[in-house]
From Swiss-Prot:
Pathway membership: Protein biosynthesis; polypeptide chain elongation
Keyword Cytoplasm part of the UniProt annotation: yes
Family membership: Belongs to the elongation factor P family.
Entry's Gene Ontology BP terms: peptide biosynthetic process
NCBIfam families: efp (TIGR00038), PRK00529.1 (NF001810)
Subcellular location: Cytoplasm
Record's protein name: Elongation factor P
Gene this protein is translated from: efp
Alphabetized UniProt keyword annotations: Cytoplasm, Elongation factor, Protein biosynthesis
A Pfam family: EFP_N
GO molecular function, one term: translation elongation factor activity
GO cellular component: cytoplasm
Summary of the function given for this chain in its UniProt record: Involved in peptide bond synthesis. Stimulates efficient translation and peptide-bond synthesis on native or reconstituted 70S ribosomes in vitro. Probably functions indirectly by altering the affinity of the ribosome for aminoacyl-tRNA, thus increasing their reactivity as acceptors for peptidyl transferase.
Length: 185
């Protein structure tokens, strides 16, 4: 059992027969009332992100998630195929479980497969990933008032805002948590 006051990003727990991972947790106490813990959590079975509020001191069951290092092989349209780096065993995961992660998957990338009691839940990407820019337009001279950016399409098809000095064909580092530009690759 784990106390909700100990919630930190990355902690996994079972609640109402579902498995969740904490994205963010905020503790609040109002006047004489009891403290609450407002959490943003991701359901690892459905991929849905919700906000749950727990009473301070409430306890939930800790979920012991097995993480296996895998390499991304390919996407066949309905599911992705991963290969275990040590046993060369291949595993397929439905695209519906990993819609956000699909924006950052390139051939050969290392990911962690999350399993709970032999049930495949989803994948965990590295915090930052290097991707190539396939298309962007040239900067317009004079368009530099405050922190100017332009739209760019990555090799996976995902679109992000990048600084004006980034050109087509360059590599950039992108955060997989919020999908934003971090730095040049």
């Amino acid at each position: 059992m784990i106390n909700v006051n100990e919630f930190r990003p990355g902690i996994t727990f079972e609640f109402e027969n579902e498995i969740y991972v904490v994205i963010s947790a905020q503790h609040s106490k109002q006047g004489r009332g009891q403290a609450n813990v407002k959490t943003k959590v991701k359901n690892l079975r459905t991929g849905a992100i919700t906000i749950k509020t727990f009473s301070g001191g409430e306890r939930v069951e800790k979920a012991h998630i097995e993480k296996i290092s895998m390499s991304f092989l390919y996407n066949d349209g309905a599911s992705i195929v991963l290969m275990d780096d040590s046993t060369y065993e291949q595993v397929a995961i439905e695209n519906t479980k990993i819609t956000w992660e699909l924006n950052f998957l390139t051939e050969g990338i290392k990911v962690k497969l999350r399993k709970f009691n032999n049930e495949i839940l989803d994948i965990e990407l590295p915090a930052k990933i290097e991707l190539k820019i396939t298309s962007t337009f040239d900067a317009v001279r004079g368009n530099t008032t405050t922190n100017p950016t332009k739209r760019a399409t990555l090799e996976t098809g995902y679109e992000i805002d990048v600084p004006l000095f980034i050109k087509e064909g360059e590599s950039v580092i992108v955060s997989t948590e919020d999908g934003k530009y971090v730095s040049r690759g």
